[in-house]
Design a protein with these regions (language model features):
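Conserved C-terminal structural/oligomerization subdomain of aldehyde/semialdehyde dehydrogenase
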Residues: 1-2, 186, 223, 277, ...
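ALDH superfamily catalytic-core signature
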Residues: 196-337, 366, 400
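Generic secondary-structure signature for well-ordered alpha-helical cores
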Residues: 16-23, 38-45, 56, 78, ...
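Short, well-ordered beta-strand elements within core beta-sheets of diverse protein domains
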Residues: 1-2, 16-23, 109, 222-225, ...
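Residue-level signal for inorganic ion chemistry
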Residues: 14, 29, 51, 73, ...
């Protein structure tokens, strides 16, 4: 249970280790990252079992997350060698202009519990590839996955001080977070978590004008038009909505279905949800595990109660599961309207609220009626509609006829109050680098 002083020690260790790491050729850093990737994949089963025991997601999902998390290490091992600058035509006959990229410095990474491996590697891998040391504060609920990753990183050859893990209790999290965001030695803060906490960290970081990346809350719309393949839409919704018990920032939270296919879609969804197996994550047939804690369970109950009081109907689930603890039944709500909490707040649970809409423009208006703008999904077979809706939705990412969109090769991030910056892809490396402009005179 570390505190502010322990955090300062970790920052000092990162500061001291930085010069040697940044001086290494990119190819050497890439080699270390590649060895880390290999070790993570060699220990995929061990890491998955640890994750399931610590966080609760089904073992099959945990295995998938380990592979997904490792993909960022592999990707940025390759991108480390591609931190290209620019040569720009000079503004005078004797002028030459060059732009180079340099590592920004000590990075603070604050990560969530819902993806305790992937959210760390998605930040640490590009930072290390760029030549930066990192201090990671993992979520209080899932410190063990972070420590396991650090052990493997050390075995891969990451030098002492380059990857530092600061674990703490919920009581000490505010002081650790404040130290990371206010220390002049930290030049970059990367945070994944709730929008209110992101705003707090942003305010704290402003005192030293740090570069900040924020991947915050989402309340993703999932739109089903009347020309869609309904079976494909149900499959996509199941993958997006109930994965990780609905505890993902990009999961479908507001399902908008066009009136002409609404009833048929509800019946198809009920059939699919009825096949979900709720249970302990280490049991082989489990599709849905428990919610992370009692507060999460209480929020799900509150959202369902609010919806039913305002006229929504529970057509499946709606209760705590017979298994007890924080298990909850996969739930479907119909006749949901925009004035309910499920429309304005991120539920973060296994609840699928179905809204009805009439026209394309109405669907766009309803989908954009949110302070969040992380992800969106829609199903249609009309190419004109696909382009129009994709351009009109106010989100950073859109799944078109697809319910799973995350990949290391594409930029992950949102707009509006869902965050700043992008993770993954070739753009992810730039988040940990500074541009430096060199003007050479007297070149004639």
């Amino acid at each position: 249970d570390m505190d502010a002083e322990d955090t300062r020690k970790a920052i000092r260790a990162a500061e001291a280790a930085w010069p040697e790491w940044r001086a290494r050729p990119a190819k050497e850093r890439a080699g270390v990252l590649r060895r880390w990737f290999d070790l993570v994949m060699q220990h995929q089963e061990d890491l998955a079992c640890l994750m399931t025991a610590e966080q609760g997601k089904p073992l099959a999902e945990a295995r998938g997350e380990v592979a997904y998390g490792a993909s960022f290490i592999e990707w940025f091992a390759e991108e480390a060698k591609r931190a290209y600058g620019d040569v720009i035509p000079g503004h005078g006959r004797d002028k030459r202009i060059v732009v180079i990229k340099q590592p920004i410095g000590v990075v603070a990474a604050i990560t969530p519990w819902n993806f305790p491996v992937a959210m760390i590697t998605r930040k640490v891998a590009p930072a290390l590839a760029a030549g930066c040391p990192v201090v990671v504060k993992p979520a209080e609920d899932t410190p063990l996955c972070a420590l396991a990753l650090a052990v493997l990183a050390e075995e891969a050859g990451v030098p002492p001080g380059i990857l530092n893990i600061v674990t703490c209790s919920k009581d000490r999290a505010p002081q650790v977070g404040e130290e990371l965001t206010t220390s002049p030695a930290v030049r970059k803060v990367s945070f994944t978590g709730s929008t209110p906490v992101g705003k707090l960290l942003m305010r704290q970081a402003s005192g030293t004008v740090k570069k900040v990346s924020l991947e915050l809350g989402g309340n993703a719309p999932f739109i089903v038009f009347d020309d869609a393949d309904l079976d494909a839409a149900v499959t996509g919704l199941m993958a997006s909505k109930y994965r990780n018990t609905g505890q993902t920032c990009v999961c479908a939270n507001r399902i908008y279905v066009q009136s002409g296919v609404y009833d048929e879609f509800v019946e198809k969804l009920k059939t699919a949800v009825g096949k979900l197996v709720v249970g302990a994550g280490l049991e082989g047939e489990t599709h849905q595990g428990p919610l992370i804690n009692q507060a999460a369970l209480d929020k799900v109950r509150r959202h369902i109660a609010d919806a039913t009081e305002r006229g929504a109907k529970v057509v499946m689930g709606g209760q705590a599961h017979a298994l007890g603890g924080t298990f909850f039944e996969p739930t479907i709500l119909t006749d949901v309207t925009q004035d309910m909490l499920v429309a304005s707040e991120e539920t973060f649970g296994p609840v699928a609220p179905l809204f009805r809409f009439e026209t394309e423009e109405q669907a766009i208006t309803m989908a954009n009626d949110s302070e969040f703008g992380l992800a969106a999904y829609f199903y249609s077979n009309d190419i004109r509609r696909i382009w129009h809706v994709a351009e009109a939705l106010e989100t950073g990412m859109i799944g078109i006829n697809d319910g799973i969109i995350s990949t290391e090769a594409a930029p992950f991030g949102g707009v509006k109050e869902s965050g700043l910056g992008r993770e993954g892809s070739r753009h992810g490396l730039d988040e940990f680098m500074e541009l430096k402009y060199l003007c050479l005179g007297g070149m004639r």
